[in-house]
Design a protein with these regions (language model features):
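Noncatalytic, basic helical substrate-engagement surface that gates or grips nucleic-acid strands
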Residues: 2-136, 145-162, 248-249, 255-263, ...
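Non-catalytic nucleic-acid-binding/docking modules located in mid-to-C-terminal regions
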Residues: 6-8, 58-59, 152, 165-301
Length: 301
């Protein structure tokens, strides 16, 4: 009689930044602390976090915050990285700090770094999670996270109630999860101000990766590319030849780091007890209100 295989437990890795940004621009600025500082992003995030915890009763969990909004290793590598974005308002930065404190007070492990982005911290945990025991559920709407998906993992855009598995990524992006970093390096990523290779769009990048697999594979077969049935293939070949170093540098931007320092091993990233004093301090100073504080305290327990 064969042994039953225990079902994989969910390990939730949450990108908090997107929910804070969404709340900042969608919640009314009538929410404020005692000094009149806006708390709309914090309120929106707190309500979302309540709903998420009540829905999942998550135990193995970590929440990542973007502390390195303009100071990550990518900015040092390529100063134009995300330079097309307006700086985060100071009022929002203050609320990021509150949201980190709130999350930690709820006993939830917090990830943040001045050198690595939230995506890198999530990637570093996912890389070290024991896949014999866990499947990772990435709670985010960030397309870059799709490159991390293993067979049993789920990318969950919670706010829009959409989920993606590794098998669905190719129909969504035209490439496999493992090729997303190469694809974005070639085709560019306007959201992060990465131009890609001049004249190589999404369709051409997909075709090249379908044929050769990786950026390395493309350059290993560079002399053969002129034989592919692609429009302006000779021009594309010449562009690739002259852009080699730049494209490999771009891939360092689009590929998530898996070696970021973590506060603990994944096995220790579990929800602990509520820090009552810490929770009271955050909810009191930010005027979140007693009703929301009670709901937060009991969420998912």
């Amino acid at each position: 009689m064969s042994e039953k295989v225990a079902p994989l437990k969910p390990f939730y890795l949450v990108d908090a930044s997107i929910y804070l940004f969404r709340a900042y621009y969608s919640f009314p600025d009538a929410f404020a602390d005692a000094d009149g500082n806006p708390t709309n992003a914090l309120n929106g995030f707190a309500y979302w976090l309540c709903q998420f915890l009540e829905e999942t009763t998550a135990s193995a969990i970590a929440v990542a915050f973007d502390q390195s909004l303009t100071s990550s290793f990518r900015n040092e590598l390529y100063p134009a990285y995300k330079a097309n974005r307006d700086p985060a308002p100071e009022q929002l930065k203050r609320q990021f700090n509150w949201a980190r404190d709130l999350t930690a007070a709820l006993g939830i492990p917090v990830l943040s770094s001045s050198d690595y982005e939230a995506d890198d911290l999530i990637a570093s945990v996912a890389h070290r999670v024991c896949r014999q025991h866990y499947r990772v559920i990435f709670v985010t709407a960030d397309k870059d996270i799709a490159q991390l998906l293993a067979a049993d993992d789920i990318l969950w855009d919670h706010a829009r109630s959409r989920t993606f598995r590794a098998t669905q990524i190719k129909s969504q992006f035209g490439v496999e999860p493992s090729q997303i970093a190469d694809f974005l390096a070639l085709a560019g990523d306007s959201a992060d101000n990465i131009p890609g290779a001049r004249g190589i769009g999404a369709k051409t990048a997909q075709r090249l990766l379908e044929e050769y697999g990786t950026l390395e594979g493309i350059y290993d077969n560079l002399d053969e590319i002129c034989n592919l049935p692609i429009r302006s293939v000779v021009r594309i070949q010449n562009t690739l030849r002259s852009s080699r170093d730049t494209l490999f540098m771009f891939r360092k931007l689009t590929q998530l780091a898996v070696d970021a320092p973590l506060p603990a091993e994944p096995s220790q990233l579990v929800r602990g007890v509520v820090d009552e004093a810490g929770l009271n301090a955050v909810t009191g100073n930010s005027r979140l209100g007693e009703r929301l504080a009670v709901r937060l305290r009991n969420a998912g327990i």
